[in-house]
Amino acid sequence: MAKEVAGLIKLQIKGGAANPSPPVGPALGSKGINIMEFCKQFNARTQDKAGKILPVIITYYADKSFDFVIKTPPVAIQLLELAKIKSGSAEPNRKKVAEITWEQVRTIAQDKMVDLNCFTIESAMTMVAGTARSMGIAVKGEFPGNN
């Protein structure tokens, strides 16, 4: 018989750096989840992604047990790392802070394909390019899907 799901918690935590302090502790403690057990499991599964911000979806059950799924880093974070900038533009339509190529957009789209709500790499690329535009990052060249 399946366990009764009590709820979901969505967090963004640095890989290999989960600890009981906020935001992890209060979010899990208020639901009665063993905070230290989650931190140990999360840190063990994300050792190879240390320092990267990772979205995690925690499913907790009525018996206070839990499961969690680790997603790929958000597109915005990947774009900031790729462009080597700390933040996007305050005025993205007027002031561009960096440039990337369509090949770099394709790389991010392929990485995020499992988490995005699309079926083709071209549609994933347009989503990534839209995020880049909204951050003030220009995409150089012609969209490769316009052949």
UniProtKB/Swiss-Prot annotation:
GO terms for biological process: translation. The keyword ATP-binding does not apply. Keywords: Methylation, Ribonucleoprotein, Ribosomal protein, RNA-binding, rRNA-binding. Disulfide bonds: none annotated. One or more lysine residues are methylated. GO terms for molecular function: large ribosomal subunit rRNA binding; structural constituent of ribosome. SMART domains: RL11. It comes from the Bacteria. GO terms for cellular component: cytosolic large ribosomal subunit. Gene3D superfamilies: Ribosomal protein L11, C-terminal domain, Ribosomal protein L11/L12, N-terminal domain. Forms part of the ribosomal stalk which helps the ribosome interact with GTP-bound translation factors. PANTHER family: 60S RIBOSOMAL PROTEIN L12 (PTHR11661), LARGE RIBOSOMAL SUBUNIT PROTEIN UL11M (PTHR11661:SF1). Part of the ribosomal stalk of the 50S ribosomal subunit. Interacts with L10 and the large rRNA to form the base of the stalk. L10 forms an elongated spine to which L12 dimers bind in a sequential fashion forming a multimeric L10(L12)X complex. Belongs to the universal ribosomal protein uL11 family. This is Large ribosomal subunit protein uL11. It comes from Phocaeicola vulgatus (strain ATCC 8482 / DSM 1447 / JCM 5826 / CCUG 4940 / NBRC 14291 / NCTC 11154) (Bacteroides vulgatus). The lineage of its organism: Bacteria, Pseudomonadati, Bacteroidota, Bacteroidia, Bacteroidales.
